[in-house]
């Protein structure tokens, strides 16, 4: 907030005419006024940041509904049939490398079929969200061992959800 605006606010606050039956306003310390202005700016910035995070739709963790992939993306399905538009840069990560290897083992790759990963949509959303943050190699390895590997076992769906909630608490 510019210094002139602070002085105007201070001037308006201290020079308000109050009637005789009302309490007289005390003057706000300029340091306190500056502190309040910074606090309001910080709160406004948090509000803007919150809107951009929840409104972000281009970078990944959303399910894809269009028939054709966006530029720089490919369409990948999960075992429960959900469809995701995945940025091509994610395909070179350790996590996706392991998911694609498991997919090839379980479903096989032919040039004519869709790519299906052996995990549920919730796991895929978590992986996409994590990769958007550009994690370290150690974090990717931890995700592979705690979240991705249990996806390979179809009978252990409860283990996948337990590992997912534990991983969300850790990261």
From Swiss-Prot:
Its main location: cytoplasm. The keyword Cytoplasm applies. Plants over-expressing SAUR39 display reduced shoot and root growth, altered shoot morphology, reduced size of vascular tissue, low yield and decreased basipetal auxin transport. Induction: By auxin. GO terms for cellular component: cytoplasm. Belongs to the ARG7 family. InterPro entries: SAUR_fam. This is Auxin-responsive protein SAUR36. GO terms for biological process: auxin-activated signaling pathway; negative regulation of organ growth; regulation of auxin polar transport. Keywords: Auxin signaling pathway, Cytoplasm, Developmental protein, Growth regulation. Transmembrane segments: none annotated. Involved in the negative regulation of organ growth. May act as a negative regulator of auxin synthesis and transport. It holds the Pfam family Auxin_inducible. Signal peptide: none annotated. It is found in: Cytoplasm. Highly expressed in mature leaves and at lower levels in young leaves, flag leaves and internodes. It comes from Oryza sativa subsp. japonica.
């Amino acid at each position: 907030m510019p210094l002139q605006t602070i002085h105007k606010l201070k001037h308006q606050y201290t020079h308000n005419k109050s009637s005789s039956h009302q309490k007289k306003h005390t003057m706000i310390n300029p340091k306190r006024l500056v502190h309040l202005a910074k606090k309001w700016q910080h709160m406004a910035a948090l509000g803007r940041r919150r809107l951009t995070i929840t409104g972000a739709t281009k970078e990944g963790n959303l399910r894809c509904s269009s028939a054709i992939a966006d530029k720089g993306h490919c369409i990948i399905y999960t075992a429960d049939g959900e469809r995701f538009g995945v940025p091509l840069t994610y395909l070179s990560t350790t996590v996706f490398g392991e998911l694609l290897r498991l997919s090839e083992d379980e479903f096989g790759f032919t040039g004519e079929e869709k790519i299906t990963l052996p995990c549920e949509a919730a796991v895929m959303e978590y992986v996409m969200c994590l990769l958007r943050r550009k994690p370290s190699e150690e974090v990717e390895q931890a995700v592979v061992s705690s979240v991705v590997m249990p996806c390979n076992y179809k009978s252990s769906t409860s283990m996948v959800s337990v590992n997912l909630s534990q991983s969300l608490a850790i990261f």
